[in-house]
Structures are given as C-alpha cells and as structure tokens.
Amino acid sequence: MPSGEPKPRKCGAPIPTERQVQRAILAMARVCFPDVLIHHSPGGAHLAGSATARFKQMGALKGDGMLVGFPDLICIWKSGVAFMEVKRPKRSVTSDEQVSMLDRITSMGWQAAIVKSVDEAHAFLKAAGAPCRADLAQ
C-alpha cells in the first residue's frame, strides 16, 4: 500500500460498552436467575464537573466506604454470594486494584470473576451455585 493512502477500515459490529454488557447481564439474570439479588457497586461511576469537583466527589464516596477496585456486581442468593467484574469484550483493561480485590475476595472463599459477556456471566453464576431457572438458548 502506498504511504499516502489511508489504511482500510475493518468492518463489523461495534464493540459494546461495559455499561451495555452489564445491562445485558442484568436482563439475562432477571430471566435465568430470578432468585438472585444483584446489586451494582458504583465504583466506576461517572463523576461530573471540574477536576476539583470530581476529586471531592471521589473523596466523599471513599469516605462513605467505597473500595477502589471492588467488583461491579454483587450477586446474593439463599446459600451463596458471588462477585462479577464486568468488562467489554475487547479493548478492556483490568486495573491492578481490581485484580487485587478479586484475589482478596477469592482468598476469603467467595466466587469472583471477570466476565465479558452474557454467556460468561451465566456460566459463572451457574458454576458458583446460583439457583438457575433457565439456560441460554444456543
């Protein structure tokens, strides 16, 4: 390819955002795992305002007990608890704090995983022992 020509663009579906993946997981869980309470920990909340305002907001959240790196979803059922860190399928980065927190949770005997799709979340919850009422259609 001559140096002055632009590179050809790859075609394909856009990569879903982390929020889109998480919402799809929650929709699946309402059908397949209705007896599981799933709570979102807003550690990755989008803060507004200037850098100073965001710094103050983050300080307030930490003062209220927010832990840096805590997983996105806490899943609770009658006989168990599991934690999911949600990432987009491609171009996602797991921070050192997130890895450390997942390691800490699993060292306490709880199930924790990074999930990048509805399929991964379903398989993880099922393997963790969450009561499942429906499998995913193939």
Residue positions per predicted region:
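Catalytic phosphate/metal-binding cores of nucleic-acid and nucleotide-processing enzymes, i.e., regions
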Residues: 1-138
